[in-house]
UniProtKB/Swiss-Prot annotation:
Gene Ontology cellular component list: cytosolic large ribosomal subunit
Organism name: Neorickettsia sennetsu (strain ATCC VR-367 / Miyayama) (Ehrlichia sennetsu)
Lineage: Bacteria, Pseudomonadati, Pseudomonadota, Alphaproteobacteria, Rickettsiales
Family in the record: Belongs to the bacterial ribosomal protein bL25 family. CTC subfamily.
Protein name: Large ribosomal subunit protein bL25
Coiled coil: none
Binding partners and assembly: Part of the 50S ribosomal subunit; part of the 5S rRNA/L5/L18/L25 subcomplex. Contacts the 5S rRNA. Binds to the 5S rRNA independently of L5 and L18.
HAMAP family, sorted: Ribosomal_bL25_CTC
GO molecular function term, any single one: 5S rRNA binding
Task of the protein: This is one of the proteins that binds to the 5S RNA in the ribosome where it forms part of the central protuberance.
One GO term of the biological process aspect: translation
Keywords: Ribonucleoprotein, Ribosomal protein, RNA-binding, rRNA-binding
NCBIfam families: bL25_bact_ctc
């Protein structure tokens, strides 16, 4: 489901005008494009708060501005260092050209993992992965199945499965994404606890 958000055009720029916008209840934002001119907009703080999970993620968003609808993908956001208020949003046009995106990793089946059930812990080293794809092929997350992981196992980038049209940009395929740590369990102990 694509989220649609209303925005207004920005005509003045710079720190002072951005602060005036923020005091008026808006967050400044920019839509970047390779073959298009950048578009400066502002989104209400209420809409940013309501849809922050989407705006900080990797899905397609529709920004409506004065009757025009722009399909965009969130690229980055800036938070205030103390209050964690959103100060600025960056988007890129959701075109047919491939772009780089940070996609979250989703660790699945931890409840089915025998090692986790017996007290081992999943040590997550990376929470996102850099990929190249079009906005149409951009996944919400990359699943990392840990059902068969045992104590001492390392899950690497080379173990991840990417959908068609999504190319991982990891510099080293042997980079570790997560490890399973804890005491090794003997075979007799597993039968006794079951």
């Amino acid at each position: 489901m694509v989220v649609s958000i209303e925005c207004i055009p920005r005509t003045s720029f710079g720190r002072n005008s951005a602060n005036v916008l923020r005091r008026s209840g808006f967050v400044p934002a920019v839509i970047y494009g390779k073959e298009r001119e950048n578009i400066n907009v502002a989104i209400s703080v209420r809409d940013v708060s309501k849809h922050f999970a989407v705006l900080s993620g990797s899905g397609v968003v529709e920004l409506s501005c004065e009757g025009k609808v722009y399909k965009v993908v969130p690229k980055a956001y800036e938070l205030h260092p103390v209050s964690s208020v959103v100060l600025h949003l960056d988007f890129v046009f959701a075109g047919e050209h491939a772009s780089k995106f940070q996609v979250p990793l989703n660790f699945v089946n931890s409840g089915k993992s025998e090692a986790i059930r017996l007290g081992a812990m999943l040590n997550i080293v990376k929470r996102t992965v850099l990929v190249r794809c079009t906005a149409a092929n951009l996944p919400k997350s990359i699943p990392v199945d840990i059902e068969n992981a045992k104590v001492g196992d390392s899950i690497k980038f080379s173990d991840l499965v990417f959908p068609d049209g999504v190319v991982p940009l990891a510099r080293d395929a042997n980079s570790v994404v997560a490890t399973v740590v804890g005491k090794k369990v003997k075979a007799g102990t597993v039968a006794a606890t079951a």
